[in-house]
Amino acid sequence: MIKTILFDLDGTLLNTIDDLADAANWVCTQHGWPTFPVETYKHFVGNGIPKLVERFSPENARTPEQLAATLAEFSARYDAHKEDKTAPYPGILELLAALKAEGFQTAVFSNKADAFCGKIIEHYFGPDSFSLVRGSRPGVPTKPDPAGVYSLMADLGADPQSTLFVGDSDVDILTGHNAGLPALGVLWGFRGEAELTAAGADALAAKPEDILAYLRCEKH
């Protein structure tokens, strides 16, 4: 029976894509690089901010030194504008309230930098909305490597048999499965049903209340 739910952040709880795209395109404009439409950024994100920076940087600006400088530039711009257009997806606040009322333990596990995760979760959901919020940290492999999930579950006192991973991309489904967890894919995020199905999602949710329905079914 599921007792703990680990949520991805971007594309699952929050629609962050416009602020990410705006910050990235601002950096591109400063350097005279090509910019990209928001739809393209939906495929650039998901593997952490360093990988996002690499993807929007032209090939002639990808030395380690250049990428480090661009990462710092992007991070500063995004930090200043990360709440301009970002918002929880419709139904997410109600879902989290229902999960809390029914006694589920919830946590966030993201490839977004840990410092950004804490700030943005507290801004949109309050300081005590999740048992733990964990982002990308130095020395810990990013998703889909399961190391971070193992660490998070240990800190939560959770085990694979009673934990569900929820996310919007193949990276999230693979993360859950690599850690021995069932993985549920959400259809309102940055990717889509075809990618989630191909990755082997154990269930799909078209709207947040479908997650609650899935969990209630798992109880019986």
Listing of model-derived features with the role each one plays in the protein:
Residues 80-108, 114-118, 146:
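Short, acidic loop-to-helix structural element flanking the phosphoryl-transfer center
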